[in-house]
Amino acid sequence: SRASNGVIVITTKKGKTGRMSINYAGNFSIAPRPRYKNFNLMNSQERVQFSEDAFAAGLRYKFEPIKQINTYEGALKMFQSGEMTSDEFIKTRNYLETVNTDWLDLLTRTSFGHNHNVSVTGASDKVNYALSVGYNSNDGQEKGNSSERLTARAAVTLNMSDNIRVNLTLNGTTGTNKGFNGVDPLNYALTTSRSIAAFEEDGSYSYYRKRLEYKYNKEVESIGYNVLNELENTGSEVNTGSLKLSFDFQWKLLSWLTYQFTGGYSYNTTNSQSWALERSTAIASTYRGYDY
């Protein structure tokens, strides 16, 4: 069976006396990636027009826009300060209207998951055994998000004599979850203007300027940011494992007296790590104070 949180729960039964029995169960799941048609969000043309209307209405920004050609607000700021001619501003504005970056396509994917379980059971007059192995893999909708889990169980009953029985049970699991560090791809795709380009004309990453607050370098006002570069240079991974062993010894000394000894061993481990490399904006804004 499958638990609600996505973890495979493997249940085995005692083998029946006779020949060995092998069973397999598996399932697959697919979920389409999100698309802009599923949301009420502006395209790049609507976003530029909205900014124009807001400026014409006399609305003010919470923070003054950073001068740059990568955003309408930044280009307008350059035009107002005389760093861009009217023709240059109109050309930039018209270009930004046509960018229409599909962030959902760049940052999400069709989710695919699959579960598999193989069990082997068997028994004789002296031995009863049940073995099972399960595997679960899921690629999340956000590119770079995935999980894997492997489970195994072995249960053996030894009838050493008419009055002595030993039960051994071993359970083991291992899993890996990969994710992000400081980046929320889906939220970024749904909240970032589509008039911002992800790539330059030559195919290289396009970096727009973000406000920088770095206490050791007050002269630098902004820093470059590209979410694809950030995802390549940051991340997180959690590895888990567990092992459980139980032992049960029963000795029927008399019809009314049975000696029983029960013991067990349990081991659990979790290794969690997150990272940001030197090319990431996270490192530049936190430690370096300037672009790579």
Language model features: what each stretch is:
Residues 257:
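An active-site-proximal structural segment forming one wall of the substrate-binding cleft
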Residues 37, 107-110, 120-124:
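Outer-membrane beta-barrel initiation region
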Residues 17, 124-125, 161-163, 252-254:
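Outer-membrane beta-barrel channels and translocator barrels
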Residues 12, 24, 118-122, 152-158, ...:
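Residues on the lipid-exposed face of transmembrane beta-strands in outer-membrane beta-barrel proteins
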